[in-house]
């Protein structure tokens, strides 16, 4: 099974149409990867589906980088 990081990166690549090497932990979805508000909503929905969890809107707004998404998923899967 792939790591959480790998699964998150794969989703980001698929959702935003960016190259895998562009998807680093520090990469901002909006500033570095060119996501708009619709992209970020779709990204959160894809993460929810992949990891079978619910990310409340107020939490989703705080997830602005790849690493923040990974950390959020880890915290909620393990917690």
From Swiss-Prot:
Pfam family, one: PP-binding
O-(pantetheine 4'-phosphoryl)serine modified-residue sites: 37
Gene Ontology CC annotation, any one: cytosol
Residue ranges of every copy of the Carrier domain listed in the record: 2-77
Record keywords: Cytoplasm, Fatty acid biosynthesis, Fatty acid metabolism, Lipid biosynthesis, Lipid metabolism, Phosphopantetheine, Phosphoprotein
Posttranslational modification: 4'-phosphopantetheine is transferred from CoA to a specific serine of apo-ACP by AcpS. This modification is essential for activity because fatty acids are bound in thioester linkage to the sulfhydryl of the prosthetic group.
UniProt-annotated location(s): Cytoplasm
Domain of life: Bacteria
GO MF: acyl binding; acyl carrier activity
UniProt family annotation: Belongs to the acyl carrier protein (ACP) family.
HAMAP family on file: Acyl_carrier (MF_01217)
Protein name: Acyl carrier protein
